[in-house]
Amino acid sequence: MTRLDNARIVRAPRGPALTAKSWLTEAPLRMLMNNLDPDVAERPGDLVVYGGIGRAARDWASFDRIVAALKDLDEDQTLLVQSGKPVGIFRTHPDAPRVLIANSNLVPHWATWAHFHELDRKGLMMYGQMTAGSWIYIGSQGIVQGTYETFVEMGRQHYGGDLAGRWILTAGLGGMGGAQPLAATMAGASCLAVECRASSIEFRLRTGYVDVQARDLDEALALIDESCRARVPRSVALIGNAAEVFAEIQRRGVRPDCVTDQTSAHDPVNGYLPRGWSIAEWEARRESDPDGVAAAAKRSMAEQVRVMLAFHRAGVPTVDYGNNIRQMALEEGVADAFAFPGFVPAYIRPLFCRGVGPFRWCALSGDPEDIYRTDAKVKQLLPDNAHLHRWLDMARDKIRFQGLPARICWVGLGDRHRLGLAFNAMVRSGELKAPIVIGRDHLDSGSVASPNRETEAMRDGSDAVSDWPLLNALLNTASGATWVSLHHGGGVGMGFSQHAGMVIVCDGSEAADRRLERVLWNDPATGVMRHADAGYPEAIACAREQGLVLPSLG
């Protein structure tokens, strides 16, 4: 099993010419390749897209077999992918998904990192994260708006809606955490982001997600102070260990205005540098002593969470940004680790109740103009959504495309299918140079069960009920999504989440119209259904307004 091959450079084809038999197979082929584009993936030579060890394919042989299968797949065939390996091609029908993916799923009793790593070493499994193994990662842009919405709501709740002159302390500049500095400045706040890898900081500087790197903590704090006094947002990256830097900031009596963290704490072996360790020592011992690495990392996480708790007790808005760091600290004896909330119950759940979540699309042409034309179409179809218009304007101005040009914007039930149909009409008319794919993060209102993140503190106590993402995947399959994925462990690690994804192609056909109308209505509707079933009044009202048939509501 060959995983590391830094000589392999993968980039998706561009333009209107097909390399597969149809756009319904060309699309997953290009998006798989795009996940491993050097401008997109964190460690493309190792097939790692983001999130610690979130991979696009199990190994390079599996990648090559998937590519070959997609190029030869007929319009009535479906490819099955098991944890990054193609395992079967079956006759289905043209409206069925062309690819069905299951990644990292384990029977609950065995759903631990230890058992996963054992299978991973044997070549029997891979970690798909959320959008890595489901082939719809679009770089850090994919989480920028969700992070922006979180920071805006944080400012609204705690600072009268104005983050000017405020600053956010955080850590982690990987594929997900790398969105934080840009999201902060877009929301009007400055940001100090601690990152242990120089390469990650360099990547965020190069792609415009962070403004400047400080030489040391003194300079970092001086830059933050200067920007706050001027009320001009600035993002500052600092190389260092999160536990050490957070503790030193607290020791100095410096008070941030908001505190969070987005290191890859969900994976204590591969995702978090233990305090006092060098990168070289960490990388070597991950192979020779993974249990020792995990133990040291969790001790350091506990130290960092204790500092976050101290800020929380001092009245600083402090939030877990979905990496399960509180759980790791709890397991290390920090009894009150969950005293500060996760970002979903604190700031995002009202959006989920209306089926609003991370709608994203990507231009298979490779031409940025196709994205700009779709941006304009979104504004035209949603003329009264000033907040969304402002987001789209900022995104065009501040977000650099990584790989195939793409866009993210949070829209909900009743709007997603309208946008999908409009994009398909633009492909049909030739206004767009090639088809568009529409997908989303697995972090959405109806597609995930994650008691320490998306479904934390549900109104009815149903945090751990994972029937909902399974139903979401089944419904998207029945509705005709182009590819559907069902994963375990994304975001928060083994044993803590199950989640589903879907992607659908706008190829300009009338058949695509029918599929788009079904999928892009049903997918967000499952989120409204899930939250209505849990008793949220906003979701119940939305379900009734939209005419959803939910028998248990009466």
Swiss-Prot record:
Active-site residues, Swiss-Prot/TrEMBL: C409
Transmembrane segments: none
Textual note on the cofactor: Binds 1 NAD(+) per subunit.
UniProt GO molecular function: urocanate hydratase activity
E.C. designation(s): 4.2.1.49
Compartments, record wording: Cytoplasm
Cofactor: NAD(+)
Catalytic activity: 4-imidazolone-5-propanoate = trans-urocanate + H2O
UniProt keyword Secreted present: no
Binding residues for NAD(+): 51-52, 129, 175-177, 195, 241-242, 262-266, 272-273, 321, 491
Domain of life from the UniProt record: Bacteria
GO terms classed as biological process: L-histidine catabolic process to glutamate and formamide; L-histidine catabolic process to glutamate and formate
Enzyme category, top tier: lyase
Role this protein plays: Catalyzes the conversion of urocanate to 4-imidazolone-5-propionate.
Protein known as: Urocanate hydratase
Taxonomy of the source species: Bacteria, Pseudomonadati, Pseudomonadota, Alphaproteobacteria, Hyphomicrobiales
